[in-house]
Swiss-Prot record:
Pfam family membership, one: TrbL
Transmembrane segments: 288-308, 394-414, 423-443, 458-478
Keyword Metal-binding: no
Main location group: membrane
Keyword terms of this UniProt record: Cell membrane, Lipoprotein, Membrane, Palmitate, Signal, Transmembrane, Transmembrane helix
Organism listed in the record: Rickettsia typhi (strain ATCC VR-144 / Wilmington)
Protein name in UniProt: Uncharacterized lipoprotein RT0028
Amino acid sequence: MKRNIFIKLLISLLLLSSCTGDTCIDPDDFGFIKFNVSSRYNPEEITSRHEGDQVAPWRDSAYKVNGYPLTIMVRPWNYILGDKNTSGQLSAWCPWYGQKNNTTTLAPFCIKLQPCTFWDNTRLDMCTPNPENRNDAMISNPPCIMTDGVGLYFLIAAKNTDPNISPDSQRKPQGITRHLGELTSSVGYEFYSISSTGQLLKAGGINYQYNGEDKSKYAQSPLYFKIIDKFYDDNSGQYRLVIKSGVSDTRPDPLQFLTDLIKDVLFGKNGIIKKTYQQIVDTPGYRISVSAILTLYIMFTGLSFLIGNINLTHVELIIRIFKISIISILLSSDKAWTFFHDYLFVFFIDGVQQILQIINEAAATGPGSQSLLGLLISTQTLSKLFSLLFVDWLGFIYIILYLIALYFIFFLIFKATIIYLTALITIGMMIIMGPIFICFMLFNITRSLFENWLRQLISYALQPIILFAGIAFISMIIRTEIYSTLGFGVCKHDFPNLGPINEIFGSFLEDIDPSLSNSIFYWWFPVPMKGGINNFHKAKILVPNDHIVVDDSCKNNHDKCKHCAAYECIDERYIELPFLDLVKDSTRINNFINGKFVQLDGILLIFVSIYLLSKFNDTAISTAQFIAGTSGNLTDIQKVNQQSYESVSQQINRPLNYVAKTISTPVTSRISAGTAQANMFFAEKFENMMMRRLEKQALSSSANKVVQNEVKRKYGIDSKDVNMNAIKDYEDGISRLLNNLPKGNELKVKELSQMKFTQLRDKISANKYDVQDYTTLSTEQKTELDKLLKDANLRVLASDANFTKDYQEAYKHAHQEMSGRGIGLFGKNIGVLRSWQEMEHSINVKRKLKEEKRIGIGEKIYAGYTGIKRAALTTIVGKDLRDAYEGNLTSAEWHDFEYNDPRLRTYSEKLKDDEKAREREKLRMHINKETLAVQADILSPEYLVKLEKAGRKSDVEYYQELAQRQLIYDVHSKLFEEGEPVMMGDRFMREKATDSQMRDMIDNAHKKYVELIDVDRYTRRQEYYDIIYEKAKENLEQTYKEVQDHFKRDNISIEEMPALIAQKVKDTNAGSEIDKKITEELNNFNADVKNYEYSTAVLNKIEDRKQTITDVVNVQIDKINKYRENAKMEQYVKPILNEGRKLRTLEDHFKNMK
């Protein structure tokens, strides 16, 4: 029986290999998408019938791009070399002499014409879809035929757009348009293809790689093609296209078709699962039962609370309300399915499908079907396989082994598919039972039933994921071997040659299969058929499979090596063996060159992979069950482990404890101190390593999106506004500048890049002119240096780099803050869990503040009582005698100095400051709550300006008041921080502070003021908005002066400017593009106005913030001077002056220019 099945399989595969329709198959072709694009259209498709002004629709390829490099090759065609003028071989078109029947063939006159050449020796911008380009192509040898993709364009249409909706959209569609006829040699590679006669020829095509956000923006967008001409009625011919990568393959996979069919029956819009679920929920008996259960649960909860049987904490209350809300939804027949499907069941249905799709895409490391089975049985793969039969005596053995391997792989994948379908059906059955088991979560006695139900759902969802993850891993190994062993070209060779058959039957056989034009008997043979180094040619080509580029920059650290997707990177390889690296695969290359096409080591690795796959299939289910069931037994396992560990550790520690007791105290102290120091050293190293990792992560594509949203919400920095390469650009700019300085090599780029722009300017001044700083330069030197720095664009680069560094710091702080609130690795990526942990953290903080306040009130009352006792004793016995006996009479610890306190406050003073700290924490929590509500940084100048623009004056005043209070608290924290506080405790300042100490405090206040301005995340943005302001101001002044000079007027208002600009353009320009010029000028003017007004408003807000910092610091300086005055010391008045400015509105600025 098995032998009959094997024979049938062999015959089927032999027949399948003859269905390719191609005379030759390229080395990297394992099932490419191929279709034709005709140069002719039906008359009703043409929009304009006037000669020289026809517009044709774009041809829909029926495929969508997937974001990977889009690689399209145009087949070569040459009639002189033997290619035929048939629909199966023709890949050229002619703009002359065509008839209606020349849709897929050339007109007889055009067959023997030469390919077109061009006067400018280039094909750039030829016949672009831009309606403004009405120039003909610069053809030097008309009439001729177009080949290699000349005149053919592809279009990646923007989502939700139709390029054929109107003639204008056909001329100028929305999306990405590229010409396939450009010379690929200009970008460093060539396309090669095997012609129908077996010759390796250069081909046309394009390799388009997306820029920046275009990859995600255009993913799953439709792909169109069109040969662009101005008159289509006399065209003839077509292009044959081969899409090598970059599109989602929609060709049906048998097993995938079966899976989708069953999934649609079960979970479709009118699927069995949904109908059955709704029938259960709509049953009156079920609704009555759920209502009764909810009533009982609420009654038991209230009764248990009244008799003190349960302690309803905030968390417990929220949990119970959450349960009641969930169960109540089951009573709503309209919302029951929608709610539970969208928020729970979708993870087990669509979530699993999405994960499997990601796994399959990751496993598809090269051309051909994403499915391993589809790759192995593709006609191209089988054709290459059977070509081995007559070139090597081992070919027959290899074919038999391959078919045996294919037999096992088919049944293993079929088994995996059955497991997946079984899991899907089981998940569906458990979802049907969901309305029953969800109710079981209410009571402790039934909660285990709900948990087991949920655990089983997770188990059956994990089974296909784990199973197909293993299959994907093994398939990557098998794919690599298939590409390496069968990655060569093949062609059909006829025997015997029946040339006259084509003359007898015409083109009938050619329409069925082009290769039947000469003979109905043929076989596949490799290209080249024989070995020899002369038959193999090296060239720069696109590497057709995923690989890692190992160069000198990453030899020692492969993690830094670049990973290239299929057809993304260029490398020098043999054209006939594009999958083999010249260095790593030199052994196999030598085998091919020596005529040994059969690689038995590859088939051996495939069998090893099959064996691993069979073992993995058997363990995948048990692995999923173990993962899903671990949580239920984790506590017991931990208890057993802990008990066994304690009994063993006690026996081990006995002699150690005895020895430790005999060691003297100084020795143990030194050991403890050394251990602590070592721990601190490693902890510091680890923390620094983690911080550096977070800094790199913040600027990489792997940055955590949730942390980025937290940065945007709390710090007002959107990752989209950050130039991820700004720091490197700034360093490169400094490096270029230093190369132009005579003594530039004395300065270090890294050190300079950490400085502010003004500090950098001082360093450059000192290096170039041997002066102290920029202020000591002469006027000529300043002018020269300013021009040098402006040409280097260092100010803008420094501003961008500082903004990027601020983003890195905010990312680190946001990550640490989220971790500090109990939000771990999983919580950062799961919205519900993150909100729950945030809520729990907020409750804990409020509870802690409440407890601290209660203790503080008690201590404050007692401190007041002891203060009254102390004042009474001072009145009776005097200050000196009081100080002598204070320790025994008045609880002096409340009013004496805390010598462990850096500010030497009394305990009573410390209590007052602690109360202020609690107020600050409450304010911080309130601001965080407001920030969460609006999902924006409410304290940022940018947000306040946006509110003012929107006319929300009351909100602006409210948020400004919060910002003012928060800023005052922040300034106080900076001034009174440990180390060098600006002011000590009140009693110390009155009784102990010396003249020099107070002078140092005032000087320290000035130093901390500078630090406050430098580190404040909002004032640091001043340089960024200064640049925007100055650029907009310069542009507006120039525009105003041009309009002023043109109309000879001085009293021009801002309202008149748009009309005057438009009139000025009309007066000074002529031609068809005048409307476009007017629009461009007005857009530039409006953009400058917008930038000026926005930057002015933000800068004024920043100045207000700086003034607040100045005022708060000056208040502290005044207090110190007051203490000095009371102590009869000399005045040391040294207030801080904020040299800020208030910027004028645009209207006032225009008036000032008149």
